[in-house]
Design a protein with these regions (language model features):
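Cell-envelope/extracellular polymer assembly enzymes that use nucleotide-activated donors
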Residues: 2-3
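Short beta-strand segments
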Residues: 6-8, 32-34, 112-114
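Short, well-formed alpha-helical segments that are part of the catalytic scaffolds
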Residues: 11-25
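Acidic donor-binding segment of Leloir-type glycosyltransferases
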Residues: 22-55
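Glycine-rich, basic loop-to-helix element that forms the pyrophosphate-binding segment
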Residues: 57-76
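Acidic metal-phosphate-binding loop of nucleotide-sugar-dependent transferases
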Residues: 60, 87-89
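Short beta-strand-to-loop acidic/aromatic patch adjacent to the donor-nucleotide binding site
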Residues: 78-87
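Conserved donor NDP-sugar-binding/catalytic core segment of glycosyltransferases
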Residues: 91-123
Length: 123
């Protein structure tokens, strides 16, 4: 199972929605949205997702924001964790492929997939 952390700051809800909708895989157990702008509209939006935990925060920065989620994840039995921006979304089945690759390659500790723009161009 995978946990996910997404750090936001006054994020557009359409962007966040697209990201969260791409994380509907059965492989995702928990998603942490760490909102560095502590906006009520983001908190309200996150309530519609059963597996999303909203963490309102002062602007502690990107890394420290993800660390807030990682502190909770480290004590869990989850095997993998994704660190994401809210403008990232996945094609269907890619998370299953990523998990399978990591399971089959125990010498790999971190994976960064190719990033492709919506136009199809490689970033």
């Amino acid at each position: 199972m995978i946990t996910v952390s997404i750090v936001t700051y006054k994020t557009n809800l359409e962007e966040l929605s697209k990201c969260l909708q791409s994380l509907t895989s059965s492989f995702i157990s928990q998603i942490y949205v760490i909102d560095n702008s502590h906006q009520q509209y983001i908190a309200d939006f996150c309530q519609q997702y059963a597996n999303v935990e909203y963490i309102g925060s002062d602007n502690v920065g990107y890394g420290a924001g993800h660390n807030q989620a990682l502190r909770q994840v480290l004590d869990s039995d989850k095997k993998y964790h994704l660190v994401l921006n809210s403008d990232v979304y996945f094609e269907p089945s890619i998370l299953e492929k990523i998990c399978r690759y990591m399971d089959e390659n125990s010498d790999v500790g971190q994976l960064t997939p190719n990033t492709i723009y919506p136009t199809g161009d490689l970033q």
